């Protein structure tokens, strides 16, 4: 058994303008090559576009989109007796949010469009409405977990 002790879980910081942790998580995931100011620009432009499109509070749209995409259950590959099984496991809230943000950004990067802010805002609005690639990814993950329910006892 390790003598080091467990690492303290860091609390997510808030972003400077909206004072929102989800926005900061989004910024840290969209970040490429250490260009954080560019990541903030993209997010804030996307939030403005959401405001123009929906005429609702953009942070509530963001929250709704992330809540809609967050998976409850996922599958994890586990090797048992020479064969690999996809074992369904429950996902915690923090890990679920991280997965949701990753899926939203991946889906928005694949979208055709002018710039990342436009694509991200479109994907977030679609996810809040219950459609889009990120929602499809969540449903696919849930289907995989349901199909492999027989292997749940390998957990």
Curated annotation (Swiss-Prot):
Pfam families: Ribosomal_S7. Belongs to the universal ribosomal protein uS7 family. Its main location: plastid. The keyword Ribosomal protein applies. One of the primary rRNA binding proteins, it binds directly to 16S rRNA where it nucleates assembly of the head domain of the 30S subunit. Part of the 30S ribosomal subunit. PANTHER family: RIBOSOMAL PROTEIN S7. One of its GO terms (cellular component) is small ribosomal subunit. It comes from Schisandra chinensis (Chinese magnolia vine). The keyword Chloroplast applies. Keywords: Chloroplast, Plastid, Ribonucleoprotein, Ribosomal protein, RNA-binding, rRNA-binding. The lineage of its organism: Eukaryota, Viridiplantae, Streptophyta, Embryophyta, Tracheophyta. InterPro entries: Ribosomal_uS7, Ribosomal_uS7_bac/org-type, Ribosomal_uS7_CS, Ribosomal_uS7_dom, Ribosomal_uS7_dom_sf. NCBIfam families: rpsG_bact (TIGR01029). This is Small ribosomal subunit protein uS7c. GO terms for molecular function: rRNA binding; structural constituent of ribosome.
């Amino acid at each position: 058994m390790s003598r080091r002790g467990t690492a303290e879980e860091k609390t997510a910081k808030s972003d400077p303008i909206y004072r929102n942790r989800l926005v900061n998580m989004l910024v840290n995931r969209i970040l490429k090559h250490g260009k954080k100011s560019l990541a903030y620009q993209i997010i804030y432009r996307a939030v403005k576009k959401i405001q123009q499109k929906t005429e609702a509070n953009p942070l509530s749209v963001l929250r709704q989109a992330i809540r809609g995409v967050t998976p409850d259950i996922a599958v994890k590959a586990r090797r048992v007796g020479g064969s690999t099984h996809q074992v369904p496991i429950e996902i915690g809230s923090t890990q679920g949010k991280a997965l949701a943000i990753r899926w939203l950004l991946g889906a928005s990067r694949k979208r055709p469009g002018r710039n990342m802010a436009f694509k991200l805002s479109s994907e977030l609005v679609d996810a809040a409405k219950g459609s889009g690639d990120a929602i499809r990814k969540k449903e696919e993950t849930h289907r995989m977990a349901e199909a492999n329910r027989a292997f749940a006892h390998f957990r």
